[in-house]
């Protein structure tokens, strides 16, 4: 579940804190983010699902702090939300997004086609003007996804189409035995920054974001951290460079 409140609801915080959201049995709070009307929410799950919806259209402002909120994503059996991220909302038709992803992928690969472009959508093919391509390129964000087996990738946020909240979402990462079978992190990253990955064996590695491959949603990613068979990545966080 998700909910939105005014910051003023937390103006006077008592010494023992305030209730931010009512939780049902077995639930826990995943994250708290400040959002604006011109932004989107991205939820990702352990089983590799993701859903993106607009703050302005899908999240009303609650007047109190003690309700359970509204459904953000419908979880499958044994699944759970692992992250909440905030993305810039970009007005773009489905045909424009698909055309941009194909053109941007070909540009990165020196003319070779993009390996995966929003396979859940069937849209008419169009050609973007140079001006429109440049505008979308300037607005593009990338979402990092990392799995328990130390695999990861960057995916254009344009591959995460905006829908209504409460659905089952779309594939954010293809999970396999090879990549650990579970997603452990999913959030936006910027060029020039770095990542820290930590395992349950206490090992860490730092990786430049620029070195992480850009790939489609329905791919398993590539090796970021070579770990032992009984070892798992448990924590991933960005290191923002000045």
Q: Where would I find each of the regions flagged by the language model?
A:
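C-terminal interaction appendages of subunits in large macromolecular complexes
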Residues: 1-242
């Amino acid at each position: 579940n998700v909910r939105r409140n005014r910051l003023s609801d937390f103006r006077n915080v008592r010494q023992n804190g305030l209730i931010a959201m009512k939780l049902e049995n077995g639930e826990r709070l995943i994250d708290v983010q400040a959002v604006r009307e011109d932004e989107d929410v991205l939820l990702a799950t352990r089983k590799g699902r993701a859903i993106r919806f607009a703050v302005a259209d899908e999240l009303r402002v609650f007047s109190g702090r003690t309700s359970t909120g509204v459904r953000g994503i419908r979880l499958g059996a044994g699944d759970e939300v692992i992250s909440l991220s905030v993305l810039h909302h970009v007005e773009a038709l489905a045909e424009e997004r698909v055309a941009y992803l194909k053109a941007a992928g070909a540009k990165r690969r020196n003319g070779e086609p993009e390996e995966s472009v929003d396979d859940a959508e069937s849209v008419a093919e169009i050609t973007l003007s140079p001006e429109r391509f440049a505008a979308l390129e300037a607005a593009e964000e990338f979402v990092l996804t990392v799995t328990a087996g130390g695999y990861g990738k960057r995916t254009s946020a344009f591959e995460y189409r905006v829908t209504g909240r409460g659905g089952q979402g779309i594939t954010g990462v293809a999970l396999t035995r090879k990549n650990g079978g579970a997603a452990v992190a999913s959030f936006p990253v910027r060029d020039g920054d770095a990542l820290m990955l930590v395992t349950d064996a206490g090992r860490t590695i730092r990786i430049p974001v620029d070195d992480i491959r850009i790939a489609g949603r329905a791919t398993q990613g590539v090796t970021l951290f070579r770990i032992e068979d009984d070892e798992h990545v448990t924590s991933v966080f960005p290191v923002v460079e000045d």
